[in-house]
Amino acid sequence: DANKINLDQFLLWYSQAGTPTLKISDSYNAATQEYQLNIEQHTPATPDMANKAAMLIPLELGLIATDGKELEFDLIEGEFVKPETNYVLLINQTQNIFKFKVNQQPTPSLLRNFSAPVIVDYPYTQTQLLNLAANDSNSFNRWEAIQTVYKQVIARLYASADEQAEYVPNELIAAISVTLRDENLDPSMRSLIATTPSFAELALQFKPVNVVKLSQAINYLRQRLSDALEDDFLALYQHHQTKHYDFNDAGKRALKNTAL
């Protein structure tokens, strides 16, 4: 094909069972301004096959600066395609290395637009997640980042003896506020980002689960966010009143209901 990619390996998606996991680590050399991603792929054994072959996995990527801006970079090692603005890394071995030329240490925005049905294992710090939640130009990753922070905060509240306001970082409140005010973001996506995970989803984190403690943790977080973001929610509720029940206004109604 035009990109000279051997797609035979891609057929493994149809013949090899199991969901691959990408274990990703990174490093940055400030002297050479080189950023490196080390990616290992592993597909767990299934009854019909113990050892799985390496898949061809497209991993869409962006790099985010500490101030939240999208970084420009050049890929200097590793296979890729670049259909539009984002690089799509081609992971085709058990271990792949990708090197980039970029002027500062970035936060990677990985698996943009859910470019492949895989599990990404990358050790994000909460600071990195909040940066992505507030600033990532990719709405899927923005949502994924803030959902992860919600789960971390609720886990801390669940484990604590008392509800602690400091367990809800101000940066989380700021990230949600930025999102709610972002008119470039679809209203339905803003509604999703401002919505905490469900009880059923959160309960999967704890075995066994203390139903009362988990309910208290969820309610505390929601109340804390409601109090801190009262002005934002009120402004959204007033702004997104809709008179017609058509498809184009569905996102606005969802955002209004979230604010309510």
Predicted features along the sequence, with ranges:
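Flexible loop/turn segments at secondary-structure boundaries
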Residues: 18-21, 45-47, 139-141, 153-155
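Amphipathic alpha-helical substructures
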Residues: 1-36, 155-177
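Generic detector of ordered, mature protein regions
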Residues: 12-13, 23-27, 35, 48-52, ...
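Long, ordered, helix-rich scaffold segments
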Residues: 7, 101-260
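Generic structural signal for short, flexible, solvent-exposed coil/loop and linker residues
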Residues: 2-3, 11-13, 17, 48-53, ...
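Beta-strand-rich binding/interaction modules
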Residues: 6-7, 19-110, 230
